[in-house]
C-alpha cells in the first residue's frame, strides 16, 4: 500500500486529479493513463507480486535503499521509484531517466 508520495504531481496522477501547467510540463512525455495504472498496481501489490510481474521491470536501485518499476512502458524514460517500509511504500515519485551516453 502506498503510504506517502515524494511530490504532489505523483499523488495527483494516482488520485486522478488535474495537474497544474507546471506539473504537466515537468511530466511531459509521460503517458499519464498508463502511469496511473502502474501506481494502482503498486498500491495493491506485495514485493512478491512485483517480482512475478516481469513487465514492470522491478529492481533495486544500485547503491540505494530505493526500488524502481517502469512508469509507462519499457521504452519510456520514466520510472516510478519508491522505498519499502514496514507499513508499505513511501516516497513514491516519477523520475525521468537521463541518457548519459550522448
How should these model regions be labeled?
Residues 3, 32-35, 51-54, 62, ...:
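Generic structural signal for well-ordered secondary structure
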Residues 62, 66-102:
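Enriched for short, Lys/Arg-rich terminal
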Residues 36-46:
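Short, amphipathic alpha-helical segments that act as regulatory/interfacial helices
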Residues 44-70:
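A short, surface-exposed loop/turn module that caps and links secondary-structure elements
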Residues 15, 47, 87:
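Residue-level marker of positions within ordered structural domains that often coincide
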Residues 1, 54-57, 93:
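Glycine-rich, flexible loop/turn motifs
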Residues 1-38:
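Arg/Lys-rich, positively charged N-terminal/basic patches that mediate binding to nucleic acids
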Amino acid at each position: 500500500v502506498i503510504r506517502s508520495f515524494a511530490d504532489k504531481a505523483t499523488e495527483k496522477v494516482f488520485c486522478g486529479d488535474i495537474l497544474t501547467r507546471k506539473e504537466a510540463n515537468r511530466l511531459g512525455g509521460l503517458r499519464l493513463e498508463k502511469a496511473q495504472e502502474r501506481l494502482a498496481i503498486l498500491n495493491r501489490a506485495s514485493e512478491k507480486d512485483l517480482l512475478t510481474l516481469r513487465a514492470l521491470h522491478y529492481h533495486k536501485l544500485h547503491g540505494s535503499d530505493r526500488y524502481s518499476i517502469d512508469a509507462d512502458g519499457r521504452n519510456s524514460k520514466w520510472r516510478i521509484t519508491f522505498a519499502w517500509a514496514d507499513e508499505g511504500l513511501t516516497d513514491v515519485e516519477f523520475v525521468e531517466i537521463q541518457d548519459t551516453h550522448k
